[in-house]
């Protein structure tokens, strides 16, 4: 089996006219598409969901699907199939999404509503133990004393998959920029598995399918360890990953050395994309075959970035891990 997959255009022509949004290839890669909601769509969406504060979406989970339907209806029901087609397409699987008119931290609640609507057109966002909600908001500042690299600004946050230390399947990851002050650097880093030049070597290694222990630090509010291999396959036999260097716990010398070499091979890949994400925009990626991370920031005493994330499962597909769910 050849683990590399050629890049093909989306079955829906990226030059096609859509109702309520536009779609173009990104400057970084044809695998990453940029979807922009028009000013009119954004305005109508916010007007129609204004009656529900974010707290209502937190307390009544069915409302998350309601706001998704409102957004899809405003896009002539072209949005949901486009999202699913793109995210389930192995040759793509990633979107940078923007809504004209949403670009300021004062609109943070509107950002949460928009991201929630998009996410719940493809599936459902899982409970986030770190925040106690279906989403998490967190801040990166110039000085950090936390117990993981999530908020540390002056180093690269290495490429990884989300959901490695929980039992729930994590098919997608959504990462939104809510605020940014005195920032230079800190671009999102992305790597598609099929663009990783060392994939075949590590996917075929005897340790690739050995269950390993993943344990989270206290800030994640997850006390139970989980066991799964770093690599698995989807229903078509293609490689997928569940990996993060911070939380995998090698049991012996052999595993430790292999994981260290794996980490180096990922971080030095020539296939890594550097993607700026302005305030109000968000990345939505297939977590099974995209790794994500963050570049370092330039130090500044008043540095501040606020992010929002959602992670969940696809409700319209069965592209899950085949052997260790």
UniProtKB/Swiss-Prot annotation:
Binding positions for Fe cation per the UniProt entry: 160, 162, 292
Bridged cysteine pairs (disulfide): none
Note on cofactor: Binds 1 Fe(2+) ion per subunit.
Catalysed reactions, semicolon-separated: glutarate + 2-oxoglutarate + O2 = (S)-2-hydroxyglutarate + succinate + CO2
InterPro entries, sorted: GlaH, TauD-like_sf
Cofactor(s) needed: Fe(2+)
Pathway: Amino-acid degradation
NCBIfam families: PRK02963.1
Oligomer and partners: Homotetramer.
Family membership: Belongs to the glutarate hydroxylase family.
Name listed for the protein in its UniProt record: Glutarate 2-hydroxylase
Gene: glaH
């Amino acid at each position: 089996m050849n683990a590399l997959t050629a890049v093909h255009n989306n079955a829906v022509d990226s030059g096609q006219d859509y109702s309520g949004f536009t779609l173009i290839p990104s400057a970084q890669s044809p695998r990453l598409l940029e979807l922009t909601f028009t000013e009119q769509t954004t305005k109508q969406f916010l007007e129609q969901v204004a009656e529900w504060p974010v707290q209502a979406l937190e307390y009544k989970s069915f409302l998350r699907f309601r706001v998704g339907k409102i957004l899809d209806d405003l896009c002539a029901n072209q949005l949901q199939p486009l999202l699913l087609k793109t995210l389930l397409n192995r040759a793509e699987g990633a979107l940078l999404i923007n809504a004209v008119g949403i670009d300021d931290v004062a609109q943070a609640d509107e950002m949460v509503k928009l991201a929630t609507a998009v996410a719940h057109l493809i599936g459902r966002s899982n409970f986030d133990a770190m925040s106690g909600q279906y989403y998490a908001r967190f801040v990166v500042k110039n000085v950090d004393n936390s117990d993981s690299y999530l908020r540390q600004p002056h180093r690269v946050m290495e490429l990884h998959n989300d959901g490695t230390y929980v039992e729930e399947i994590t098919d997608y990851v959504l990462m939104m920029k809510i605020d940014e002050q005195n920032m230079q650097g800190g671009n999102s880093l992305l790597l598609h598995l099929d663009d990783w030049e060392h994939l075949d070597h590590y996917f075929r290694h005897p340790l690739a399918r050995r269950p390993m222990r993943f344990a989270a630090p206290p800030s994640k509010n997850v006390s139970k360890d989980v066991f799964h291999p770093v690599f698995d396959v989807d229903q078509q036999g293609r490689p997928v990953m569940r990996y993060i260097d911070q939380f995998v716990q090698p049991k012996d010398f052999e595993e430790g050395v292999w994981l260290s070499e794996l980490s180096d091979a990922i971080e030095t890949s020539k296939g890594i994309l550097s993607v700026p994400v302005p305030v109000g925009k968000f990345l939505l990626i297939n977590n099974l075959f995209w790794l994500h991370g963050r570049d370092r920031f330039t130090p500044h005493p008043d540095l501040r970035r606020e992010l929002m994330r959602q992670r969940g499962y696809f409700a319209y597909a069965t592209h899950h891990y085949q052997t260790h769910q």
